[in-house]
Amino acid sequence: MVNTRPIAAIDIGTNSVHLLVARPIDGGPPEVLTTEKAPIRLGSGSHDMKRLDPDAMSRAVDALDRFRQIAEAHNAEIVAVATSAVREAEDRSSFLKRVRDEAQIDVGVISGVEEARLIHLGALGSVPAADRRHLVIDIGGGSTEIVVGEGTTAILARSLKVGHIRLTNRFFPGGRIESDQVRACRRFVKAFIAPVAREVRERGFDVAIGCSGTIENLALMAADRSGNPARTVDNLALTRGALSDLADDITSRLEPDDRVDIRCLDPHRVDVIVAGAILLRELCKAFDILELVVSAGALREGVVLDR
């Protein structure tokens, strides 16, 4: 049976604001009607991410008003969720009020654990791994979600306050690299993820899945370097060896301008891809991941599947 009314899933993240309009289908993946993305950078307002960037708030409100109009054109039910940047911001109430008043959207601020649960559902919608114990990793701008699952049940769900924008703000402000900063970032990440790494290794997994923009972009860059450029990220494999080689190249390019000619690098990620590559490489080492399978599904798809 088909649910005749589409869902407009809106994800207000630390780096970008996304829209997915899709029609849920019983027993199958949702039918995607349209998608939109606006690179807002809400989480760049302060070093500690306790304040939202004022200009980014205005950009977000404008994007959300446009998303509402798109959703209404599809007669879709709007489900909007906000994650790390809004979750932690001391001024989140004023931002949410602006969104409600100016874009006419009520936003739910979800916990890190709920974010992980929805990401897990969305990832499994694209990578058929429910029959095996699996690990899901989602690197965002402000947080990283880790799930070990069996079927559609999460037996371990963690949300870590570490992401590519948070690390960039701390270690690589402006996107410029110093070699001692790279070493410091690696040491910090290694220590920060050690407790969850022990939990993951204790539970074990048969397949590792990665999702969202940072992992997708790294996988596309690695595929291009292998001589087999990918047309889609879904089910694309990223080996630890290929990731390590790519991360070495990225961290050797000291200025953001030095990275603009990296093939397949999203131009909106030139400054934050350094932190993203370091974080993913350290996660793969700590979890003993030899190969990561990329899922195009994540939070937004999980919101649709959860309705």
What are these regions (language model features)?
Residues V2-I7, V21, G45-H74, T83-R133, ...:
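Helical "lid/coupling" subdomains associated with nucleotide-phosphate turnover
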Residues G13-N15, E77, S93, G140-G142, ...:
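Short flexible coil/turn linkers enriched for glycine and charged/polar residues
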